[in-house]
């Protein structure tokens, strides 16, 4: 998906309880806004996917920061890596209502548009000497040491240490309340781009994919079972399909991705992360499973 060939994804009905144009400073404001979302409101937005380009760097970095929070990972440098391989992956942006009439107008839309999501993959094996990738590898192993079983720690170390079977870090981040169906064309496009790169003998022949997903846990109370709510609905299915995984609480860190004005009576949920270990060869099947999951099949 080249930068100058946008692919319309679909029209989404989005709950506007997150101000997509707000700054990170606004995320820390806990006071309810007089115009806060009151529930049962919908806004229709047309989204499209296109290749990431240089002006997207800040938006991609902010999405990565929401995933890693206070982790010592250089999200700016990671965003640059994603853009440098712009033949792989897509960003989500809003369609131009008036249509694109010229390359100049297209360039202006790219420069001025908000990035609503990013779907891509980074090679943790081939790029292990890049600062942000080295930091990510350390982060994963450190979290596993604290929160995973000894067996999972050992398996994860062996996977990351292997030079023969490359490991891809799958990135599937978007603003909350953008429905899960948008993930299918993005992941399908990513799979096609990976296959095209493999055909050119590029380093995208992965044995394993790692995916870090966000979810929130409503703790059990008064005999009621706990409940996990995934930020991206499809991540619940991927979690079930993972070869193995481990999770950890982010309660001590502020998750700006879910900040905003809560509905009165909503329970405050504890933010978590879960690292999923997926077999790369099963990605096409996983995408089909997501489609059926979305369709309620």
Curated annotation (Swiss-Prot):
A Pfam family matched in the record: BCCIP
Region of interest (Disordered), residue spans: 1-40
GO cellular component, one term: nucleus
Molecular function, one GO term: protein kinase regulator activity
InterPro entries per UniProt: BCP1_family
Family the UniProt entry places it in: Belongs to the BCP1 family.
The protein, known as: Protein BCCIP homolog
Species for this entry: Drosophila melanogaster (Fruit fly)
Lineage of producing organism: Eukaryota, Metazoa, Ecdysozoa, Arthropoda, Hexapoda
